Amino acid sequence: MSDLEQLERQILEDIAAAVDEQGIEAVRVAALGKKGTVSEKLKTLGGMSPEERQMQGPAINGLKNRVTEALSERRTELRKAAVAARLEREKVDVTLPVRESAASRGRIHPISQVIDEITAIFADMGFSIAEGPDIETDYYNFTALNFPEGHPAREMHDTFFFNPDEKGERKLLRTHTSPVQVHTMEKFAAMRDKEGRDEPIRIVIPGKTYRMDSDATHSPMFHQVEGLVVDKSANVANMKWVLEEFCKAFFEVPSVKMRMRPSFFPFTEPSVEVDIQCDRSGPHVKFGEGNDWLEILGCGMVHPNVLRMSGYDPEVYQGFAWGMGIDRIAMLKYGMPDLRAFFDADVRWIEHYGFRPLDIPTLFGGLSA
């Protein structure tokens, strides 16, 4: 066996014997470092004759390449083994029961729970969920919804505006989820015109909205849910039935009395506000009984101007829409006194008012059981 073969055998044995990356590095330095055994062999090439160099050069360089490859392979093996060992030490048995302590139990935030309850109810009535961007243009937030120039909502003290862009246009944080109604109508109108699919619209729109307001019952960021129906035969009777069914299901009562009061919204005509019967004599509001009335939501028939700007002929199509504050109805249903507590991230509050993760709301099993 030649000297090179003996040297290669010894180095490969040292590599195989290394048990960690420090050991591999020590072998590399001993073989390929400045004064390493393979490096010393390479240095001898300079003192050889051309004939000897031609014979020994490929052999020594081949040794260097094989040693380098063996070092790399062993280093990879050791890294994989280290990762596997760490995973074995840190593995968690996901089948073990959760520790029953207040600190370890997760809770669903009431806002998330109420959104799930609302969407479950409307999904049962054939509605789909629609969403849109929090940052909107003036057109979709105001103009397309029939807000005239000079309307108070367009003022800086009511709306969060961004600085104008290079074209002088200002975007804003949406003040309601209504822009999604316009986006959806435009989408369906385009589908009708291009593909001939004249489908009715039935959507519910939960989301965050923003206004410059902050007190015990108002927050600069709050949650709204709106609904929209557009069809050739949509009418006030349909709207009243949908809202009655929603109120009965959401407040979990067998029947509910509703009254509609004339109101004004730029995007609906006629516009009404809906009150439902309740009893406010105790610490918590009881719905479906008593002699009191409580405002729940606003609604109305979609204004002809809104239909027209969204691609619908108001002589052919009608629609109705409604909207309510998710935070407010959560407070009413579950007896929460201060809206600001929703956003304080107080673990004690979440523990008290939150819901268990597996309490998935369904109409069949009960919404908040």
Swiss-Prot record:
GO molecular function, one term: phenylalanine-tRNA ligase activity
Cofactor field: Mg(2+)
Enzyme class: ligase
EC number assigned by the record: 6.1.1.20
Binding residues for Mg(2+): E269
Cellular compartment(s): Cytoplasm
Signal peptide range: none
Key words, A-Z: Aminoacyl-tRNA synthetase, ATP-binding, Cytoplasm, Ligase, Magnesium, Metal-binding, Nucleotide-binding, Protein biosynthesis
One Pfam family hit: tRNA-synt_2d
Keyword Membrane attributed: no
Keyword Oxidoreductase: no
SUPFAM superfamilies in UniProt: Class II aaRS and biotin synthetases, tRNA-binding arm
Cofactor details (free text): Binds 2 magnesium ions per tetramer.
InterPro entries: aa-tRNA-synth_II, aa-tRNA-synth_II/BPL/LPL, Phe-tRNA-synth_IIc_asu, Phe-tRNA_ligase_II_N, Phe_tRNA_ligase_alpha1_bac, Phenylalanyl-tRNA_Synthase, tRNA-bd_arm
Main location class: cytoplasm
Enzymatic reactions: tRNA(Phe) + L-phenylalanine + ATP = L-phenylalanyl-tRNA(Phe) + AMP + diphosphate + H(+)
GO cellular component: cytoplasm
HAMAP family membership: Phe_tRNA_synth_alpha1 (MF_00281)
Family the UniProt entry places it in: Belongs to the class-II aminoacyl-tRNA synthetase family. Phe-tRNA synthetase alpha subunit type 1 subfamily.
Subunit record text: Tetramer of two alpha and two beta subunits.
Annotated protein name in UniProt: Phenylalanine--tRNA ligase alpha subunit
Species for this entry: Brucella abortus (strain 2308)
Lineage: Bacteria, Pseudomonadati, Pseudomonadota, Alphaproteobacteria, Hyphomicrobiales
Gene: pheS
